[in-house]
């Protein structure tokens, strides 16, 4: 039987104090974060506009942490080389804009030393990403959006857990990430469905004790894995 994918807690830096990004990143790592989740939006694929490669490059000078980059952009291939040079660790693109070129995209991401992942919006059937996980040159992570991508602080969509369950049943050792509305009140549902990578923004950064939230998220994932 394949080993369970390790629990990974990834604070969403979109919810951090951008004026003190390096200090916020350091604080999250000290409090137990495994990854730092970086949302890159172009104002086209989603209405919001956030950061790009220059911010990743600046942050990389101050941290050795795994920078988990989620590309909510129309042309992800344009970002591969700049983000690789900037020091990105993971590069997760959206299937909705990559249906015709995902093989080439995965190849270029790996060639630049980054870890490829694929994400899907709430309205996209989970079956669309199966070929990318099963390919000869596969993605190594699937990100299931549990809100409509673009803005933080939205309400968690529990119906998306059907996608997580389907993925975990087919791929026992795959990194399955969930993003949107995750916190102490919703983590158990996500963890029991099979998610092992947890992105959380406002529930961590808005907490009086962010380290306790990170610890609670991890315990929920590990507890669910021990039951299964």
Curated annotation (Swiss-Prot):
The entry's protein name is Ribulose-phosphate 3-epimerase, cytoplasmic isoform
Q: In which tissues is it expressed?
A: Predominantly accumulates in roots and seedlings.
Principal subcellular localisation of the protein = cytoplasm
NCBIfam families for the chain:
PRK05581.1-4, rpe
Annotated PANTHER family: RIBULOSE-5-PHOSPHATE-3-EPIMERASE (PTHR11749)
Role noted for this protein: Catalyzes the reversible epimerization of D-ribulose 5-phosphate to D-xylulose 5-phosphate.
Entry keyword set: Carbohydrate metabolism, Cobalt, Cytoplasm, Iron, Isomerase, Manganese, Metal-binding, Pentose shunt, Zinc
The keyword Transmembrane belongs to this UniProt entry's keyword annotation: no
The cofactor note from the UniProt entry for this protein is: Binds 1 divalent metal cation per subunit. Active with Co(2+), Fe(2+), Mn(2+) and Zn(2+).
According to the record's subunit comment, the protein's assembly and interactions are: Homodimer.
Q: Where does a divalent metal cation bind?
A: 37, 39, 70, 179
SUPFAM superfamilies with a match to the protein in the record: Ribulose-phoshate binding barrel
Q: Which organism is it from?
A: Oryza sativa subsp. japonica
- Please name the catalytic residues of this protein: 39, 179
What EC number(s) does its UniProt record assign?
5.1.3.1
Cofactor(s) listed in the protein's UniProt record: Co(2+); Fe(2+); Mn(2+); Zn(2+)
Q: Does the keyword Cell wall biogenesis/degradation apply?
A: no
Could you tell me which Pfam families the record lists for this protein? Ribul_P_3_epim
What is a biological process (GO) this protein takes part in?
A: pentose-phosphate shunt, non-oxidative branch
Question: GO MF terms on file?
Answer: D-ribulose-phosphate 3-epimerase activity; metal ion binding
Recorded family membership: Belongs to the ribulose-phosphate 3-epimerase family.
Residues binding substrate: 12, 70, 150-153, 179-181, 201-202
Q: Where in the cell is it found?
A: Cytoplasm
- Catalytic activity entry: D-ribulose 5-phosphate = D-xylulose 5-phosphate
Q: Name one GO cellular component term.
A: cytosol
Q: Which pathway does the protein contribute to?
A: Carbohydrate degradation; pentose phosphate pathway; D-xylulose 5-phosphate from D-ribulose 5-phosphate (non-oxidative stage): step 1/1
């Amino acid at each position: 039987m394949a080993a369970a994918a390790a629990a990974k807690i990834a604070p969403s830096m979109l919810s951090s104090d951008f004026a003190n990004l390096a200090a916020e990143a350091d604080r999250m790592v000290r409090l137990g974060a495994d990854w730092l989740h970086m949302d890159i939006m172009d104002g086209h694929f989603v209405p919001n506009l956030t950061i790009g490669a220059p911010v990743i490059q600046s942050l990389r000078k101050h941290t050795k942490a795994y920078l988990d980059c989620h590309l909510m952009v129309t042309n992800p291939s344009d970002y591969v080389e700049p983000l690789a040079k900037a020091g990105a660790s993971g590069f997760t693109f959206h299937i909705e804009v990559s249906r015709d070129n995902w093989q080439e995209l995965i190849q270029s991401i790996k060639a630049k030393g980054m870890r490829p992942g694929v994400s899907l919006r709430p309205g996209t059937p989970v079956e669309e990403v199966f070929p990318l996980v099963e390919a000869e040159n596969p993605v190594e992570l699937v990100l299931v959006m549990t809100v409509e991508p673009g803005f933080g602080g939205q309400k968690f969509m529990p119906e998306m857990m059907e996608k997580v369950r389907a993925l975990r049943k087919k791929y026992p050792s795959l990194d399955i990430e969930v993003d949107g509305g995750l916190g102490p009140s919703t983590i158990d549902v996500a963890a029991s469905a099979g998610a092992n990578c947890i992105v959380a923004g406002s529930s961590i950064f808005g907490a009086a004790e962010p380290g306790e939230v990170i610890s609670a998220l991890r315990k929920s994932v590990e507890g669910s894995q021990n039951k299964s």
